[in-house]
């Protein structure tokens, strides 16, 4: 009977140690994401936050704050990626990313980012039209202005 109780106690200790290790890894990923933001490396930041979010969900209640922080960061970082695509004149990719941003922002209850993403869409198409007009690509300009 004592061996059985010791075995159960050892199992609980191992589980709690594994959970603490997972929490440390998730926190490290989150911190790496924050560092990537400061360097304006949006893609790396998004990757880190998404991984930290997934790890946090598996950890449970101990990671509620981490999960909330990730859900707060992910929509804004995704919006920055879309803005970079617009700056690089990758309008079709940016349009898809902005749709994704709006969905993610609504899912994570970030109305401000969702609104910004929706407001950016017509501005982006207008910019596409202006850029095409400068190149005398009238068909593409008309397409951009029509959207």
Could you describe each region identified by the protein language model?
Residues 7-15:
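Bacterial N-terminal signal peptides
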Residues 42, 91-92, 138:
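TPR-repeat structural position
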């Amino acid at each position: 009977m004592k061996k059985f109780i010791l075995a159960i106690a050892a199992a609980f200790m191992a589980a709690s140690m594994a959970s603490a290790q997972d929490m440390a890894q998730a926190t490290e990923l989150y911190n790496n994401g924050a560092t990537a933001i400061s360097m304006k490396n949006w893609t790396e930041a998004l990757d880190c936050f998404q991984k930290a979010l997934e790890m946090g969900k598996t950890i449970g209640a101990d990671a509620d704050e981490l999960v909330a922080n990730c859900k707060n960061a992910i929509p804004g970082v995704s919006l920055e990626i879309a803005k970079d695509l617009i700056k690089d004149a990758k309008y079709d990719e940016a349009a898809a990313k902005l749709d994704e941003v709006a969905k993610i922002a609504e899912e994570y209850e970030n109305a401000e980012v969702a609104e910004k993403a929706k407001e950016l869409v017509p501005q982006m198409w207008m910019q596409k039209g202006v850029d095409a007009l400068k190149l005398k690509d009238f068909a593409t300009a008309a397409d951009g202005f029509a959207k």
